[in-house]
UniProtKB/Swiss-Prot annotation:
Identification of the protein by name: Large ribosomal subunit protein bL27
Example of a GO cellular component annotation carried by this entry: ribonucleoprotein complex
Xref: Pfam families: Ribosomal_L27
Family membership: Belongs to the bacterial ribosomal protein bL27 family.
Region (Disordered): 1-26
Keyword annotations of the record: Ribonucleoprotein, Ribosomal protein
GO molecular function terms listed in the Swiss-Prot or TrEMBL record: structural constituent of ribosome
GO biological process terms held by the UniProt record: translation
């Protein structure tokens, strides 16, 4: 006769995969039209000039240029894409 009961399987021990959120491009980096700049949940970053806001709050470039981060109000960080003559092809 066994002195220990058979060990049952654990009800824990699983997790979902990460959602790959966050910055995809940083300040000063060159982007093409359509490039994703930030993937986020909610609006941690707000769209500025030449960027779009997707339905899942993804910020993406509408034109080719350089990424620029700036603050307008105290707690709001905006992201714009500055069209540079040297980057225009």
């Amino acid at each position: 006769m066994a002195t220990k009961k058979a060990g049952g399987s654990s009800k824990n021990g699983r997790d979902s995969a990460g959602r790959r959120l966050g910055l995809k491009k940083t300040d000063g980096q060159l982007v093409n039209a359509g490039n994703i700049i930030v993937k986020q949940r909610g609006t941690k970053f707000y769209p500025g000039k030449n960027v779009g806001l997707g339905k899942d709050h993804t910020i993406f470039s509408l034109v080719s240029g350089k990424v620029k981060f700036f603050r307008k109000k105290k707690n709001r960080v905006f992201i714009s894409v500055v069209v540079d003559d040297s980057t225009a092809a």
